[in-house]
Amino acid sequence: MAEALQELAAHVEMRQPDAILGHRIEFGELTLDVAPNRIVGLVEFLRTDARCRFSSLVDITAVDHPERPARFDMVYHFLSMYQNHRIRLKMQVREDETVASIHSVHPSANWFEREVFDMFGILFTGHPDLRRILTDYGFRGHPMRKDFPTTGYTEVRYDEVQKRVIYEPVKLVQEYRQFDFLSPWEGADYILPGDDKART
């Protein structure tokens, strides 16, 4: 399997040299590092090339790395049922950078890209309907970013008296708790039953 993936990587790198920055095989899957300005052309190639035929878009997501200048990793997963392969495309994107939509190649990317926009705030150029898909209309922020507060900014609840949904600032019933302490189990060297036999 690894040999077939290595051959596939060499084929893609040979046919799309400007798009591929590098590759690796991890967990039985091929990962290609992609130049952001080449994503649409590469996805089109992977879908139509006879040796690839990655016709199924499985998922699009992002990973937040706030400490990096290119804050986000955009991650695309594709499946080729014809070749029985999976492939992962990764590209690094700055916070102020837009990403070209692959909706024209894979119409199923529509809702995946909307979800990435909603959760991470990454903008897609050429998307037909880029608006929130999981959060409410007036939602502030992007909840999958690592700098988003775990409590959120507003509390949404249904009010029985007013017979409608109301929005209120978050009110915590207790103070934040600090869990930064050493566990009694960390660093201990316990002798468990049966360990004494292994040492002799």
Swiss-Prot record:
The keyword rRNA processing does not apply. It comes from the Bacteria. InterPro entries: NADH_DH_suC, NADH_quin_OxRdtase_su_C/D-like, NADH_UbQ_OxRdtase_30kDa_su, NADH_UbQ_OxRdtase_CS. Keywords: Cell inner membrane, Cell membrane, Membrane, NAD, Quinone, Translocase, Transport, Ubiquinone. Its main location: membrane. It catalyses: a quinone + NADH + 5 H(+)(in) = a quinol + NAD(+) + 4 H(+)(out). Belongs to the complex I 30 kDa subunit family. This is NADH-quinone oxidoreductase subunit C. The lineage of its organism: Bacteria, Pseudomonadati, Pseudomonadota, Alphaproteobacteria, Rhodobacterales.
